[in-house]
């Protein structure tokens, strides 16, 4: 679990996302509160529930990007899902409890990696012995055996060469475990336990024996380390730790929640909107979900919901769900100045990406201050005149601007291009000023 302070989290987010201070501060505090809660006494800790967040803002201003970056910082089970992918229980489609099952699978993978990391040194030793056994087979009969000291010395010589990388390209025959065959079974609601038992049965039936393969020692060493580390991991402890991690540190990011708001009066069941909201209620409030790894309680899982709310309002969510998302954060629409900062300030910004890509062809591209200002202004104008899609408009504008250079780069190695205001004007002015062209091309 991340022990970063709110200030450190915001600083990390600033490296990738421009503006949106309120949203960054809210998610930073929420993430830090996960750590603070774990410092409390066990009895008191159970009473402290997470304050779920609702992020409201137009498309392309950074809501989803905040989620992506937060996932890397959290060092905890994190899942991002689209609310529109789910339907009400009893209808064809994914039910919302699948969110927790997927989150548990992520936690299992995360915990396995952590445990395998702890026993990696021992796994390397075991893998080394298996490679030495392949290089120096043990004698089958007593009369084939040589002097014990000589055999031991030879093994040590080969061990030294192996560690120094002198044998990396030598080929050996080793027995490698075959990957297990996974079978996905769709189950009706309430039948998850039976489905899990069937999957376990098929898994055991489909477990293939180890296969002898010829490969280079360098590749074999990596495979054997993974195999030996997997043997050292206790599967029951792994499941217990993973479920504990989900229950105490799990984070669910619900994107596009505005798309499941009920709009106007409709007849018949609304299985992918209001029905989904009702199914989300017990998850957000706290319930127990059956997974193939065990029972998972959702009482202390943090939920962060986000939506553009262009066709609906937060008040269109059912009241019970509104009450379970107490922290509201409004993200600001992006200005021309924000676009300018997006083009230059973030790590691996758009301009840096194009410079690096063209550099692979031996073409030098330089973006001037005036050129960047013109690109930002053009993107902002198109957003104002047509649909406002936020920072995503920059991708379209930049691709159109760089189209000729990208096409001809492979034939112009050693050339240099300066992207200034005049260049931008020559390539984009017609498209920006003509609303019909802007609508269909940019």
Curated annotation (Swiss-Prot):
GO terms for cellular component: HslUV protease complex. Gene3D superfamilies: 1.10.8.60, DNA helicase RuvA subunit, C-terminal domain (1.10.8.10), P-loop containing nucleotide triphosphate hydrolases (3.40.50.300). One of its GO terms (molecular function) is proteasome-activating activity. ATP binds at residues 18, 60-65, 255, 320, 392. Keywords: ATP-binding, Chaperone, Cytoplasm, Nucleotide-binding, Stress response. One of its GO terms (biological process) is proteolysis involved in protein catabolic process. Pfam families: AAA, AAA_2. It is found in: Cytoplasm. It comes from the Bacteria. CDD domains: RecA-like_HslU. PANTHER family: ATP-DEPENDENT CLP PROTEASE ATP-BINDING SUBUNIT CLPX-LIKE, MITOCHONDRIAL-RELATED, ATP-DEPENDENT PROTEASE ATPASE SUBUNIT HSLU. A double ring-shaped homohexamer of HslV is capped on each side by a ring-shaped HslU homohexamer. The assembly of the HslU/HslV complex is dependent on binding of ATP. ATPase subunit of a proteasome-like degradation complex; this subunit has chaperone activity. The binding of ATP and its subsequent hydrolysis by HslU are essential for unfolding of protein substrates subsequently hydrolyzed by HslV. HslU recognizes the N-terminal part of its protein substrates and unfolds these before they are guided to HslV for hydrolysis. Belongs to the ClpX chaperone family. HslU subfamily. HAMAP family: HslU. This is ATP-dependent protease ATPase subunit HslU. It comes from Shewanella putrefaciens (strain CN-32 / ATCC BAA-453).
